[in-house]
Design a protein with these regions (language model features):
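A short, hydrophobic secondary-structure junction motif
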Residues: 15-21, 59-64
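Active-site recognition of the HExxH zinc-binding catalytic motif
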Residues: 17-32
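Active-site and adjacent substrate-binding regions of carbohydrate-active enzymes
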Residues: 11, 29-30, 38-39
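Conserved catalytic/binding loops enriched for acidic/polar residues
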Residues: 36-38, 42-196
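Short pre-active-site segment immediately N-terminal to the catalytic Zn-binding motif
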Residues: 2-18
Length: 198
């Protein structure tokens, strides 16, 4: 993915993610910043795990890329992007919209809806973590985080940022052009560094 212009496949996947996230909002889903915390950090470097679950159980989380993946992980099959729909999203939409037979009003649906909650409440993939706006009260519900170990995730992310910094000019400068692409990439590295939760 070290290119000035992304391949169509990557752009299509990115657009699908943004569209699905926004459609989630139109269906009533709020940001679920606690979703990505349910994944063990090591699982985010596992090809079989990321193939099945991607980076988060909810597209309503801001887990846009697998920044803990290390050189060689992608070649082994580790997925770097969010799911089309996560298991939490499917569950939440089912809970909110599924028709429950033999009920004629919302009060009669309560028993079934409560049972569905009880069934999943011990599974961390179905945890909801509201977006925190003014201060971080719950460290498991942060934006732009991955996995259940923020210290190790931050250290892996910093390792990747160091690789980028060592190659910034090589990957972003076109001979004969200005350094604006290099400057833009540098600003993105600084921005990513500011998002690390350690």
């Amino acid at each position: 993915m070290r290119k000035q212009v992304f391949d169509d496949e990557i752009m299509q996947e990115s657009i699908r993610y943004v569209a699905a996230h926004e459609i989630g909002h139109t269906l009533g889903l709020m940001h679920n910043m606690g979703a990505s915390y349910s994944f063990p950090l090591d699982s985010l470097r596992s090809p079989s795990f990321t193939k099945k679950y991607s980076t988060t159980p909810s597209i309503m989380d801001y887990a846009r890329n697998n920044f803990v993946a290390q050189p060689g992980d992608m070649e082994k099959g580790v997925k770097l992007t969010p799911p089309v729909l996560g298991v939490y999203d499917i569950y939440a939409i089912n809970w909110g919209y599924r028709i429950i037979p033999d009920t004629n009003n919302p009060k009669n649906e309560k028993k079934t809806l409560s049972a569905w909650i009880e069934e999943k409440k011990q599974d961390p993939m179905y945890k909801f973590g509201a977006q925190q706006f003014y201060s971080v009260i719950d460290p498991t519900d942060q934006t732009e985080d991955l996995g259940n170990d923020h210290i190790r995730a931050g250290n892996l992310s910093i390792k990747n940022l160091k690789i980028i910094m060592q190659n910034l000019e090589k990957w972003n400068y076109t001979p004969g052009e200005t350094y604006s692409d290099v400057a833009g990439a540098y600003n993105e590295v600084v921005k990513q560094l500011s998002l690390i939760h350690i």
